Amino acid sequence: MIENRRGLTIFSHTMLILGIAVILFPLYVAFVAATLDDRAVFETPMTLLPGTQLLENIKTIWVNGVGVNSAPFWLMMLNSFIMAFSITVGKITVSMLSAFAIVWFRFPLRNLFFWMIFITLMLPVEVRIFPTVEVIANLKMLDSYAGLTLPLMASATATFLFRQFFMTLPDELVEAARIDGASPMRFFRDIVLPLSKTNLAALFVITFIYGWNQYLWPLLIITDVNLGTAVAGIKGMIATGEGTTQWNQVMAAMLLTLIPPVVIVLAMQRAFVRGLVDSEK
């Protein structure tokens, strides 16, 4: 008996199209708003046809920022990139070395240390964030790149993922390295790192987007407008009280913040997908 799957195929494709429409429609509305002038963006209902002011709106926020005493948006983008890249490199480095030590070094209470790291996943961010802010304040790292990045470089999730991957590597690799007289760090550099390329690519993409999209942490740590990040800076563009929000410029800023993560994903999509597939095996 041959099943007729035509109905299922039509249904699945219909749901896929609806899902894409739900995701893309708000982005399209934001794009249209970014192309309008100050008058057209406040018309009710707002037009869904693109205007001609996109480059002008981008130029305005890129050079002058939005709002009183606002930093140029290019500076916010630069701060966001420095933050995201630093968090990504730091988190991967710390997590890989931590997992490597837990898996291949024999020392007392190593499993206890691992579970102490892992148990932090059970704590909500809201529980940990204010004690972390107090520590950063006591260390005089407010309004600094160090305060923005260092607390976010530790990751129980990344450590756990690398530990699980390292545990799948055969013991024969370790024995062969020992016979060749390789030191632990040489074994890590020459064998473990090359075998971890796909996992590194997947984690790089995920961690970069995580760092780029940070909103609450920069708001708590940074008061200097010249150290503000793009995602948190958009919030400052929205007026409160009787002020008027320039929504066309806010939407233009939002579109600019999409560019770096999209570029990273497109540039590394093959390695990213391969890393996710390999991690499931």
Curated annotation (Swiss-Prot):
It comes from the Bacteria. Its main location: membrane. Gene3D superfamilies: MetI-like. Residues 77-268 form the ABC transmembrane type-1 domain. It is found in: Cell inner membrane. The chain crosses the membrane at residues 16-36, 85-105, 113-133, 142-162, 202-222, 247-267. PROSITE patterns: ABC_TM1. Belongs to the binding-protein-dependent transport system permease family. UgpAE subfamily. This is sn-glycerol-3-phosphate transport system permease protein UgpE. It comes from Salmonella typhimurium (strain LT2 / SGSC1412 / ATCC 700720). The lineage of its organism: Bacteria, Pseudomonadati, Pseudomonadota, Gammaproteobacteria, Enterobacterales.
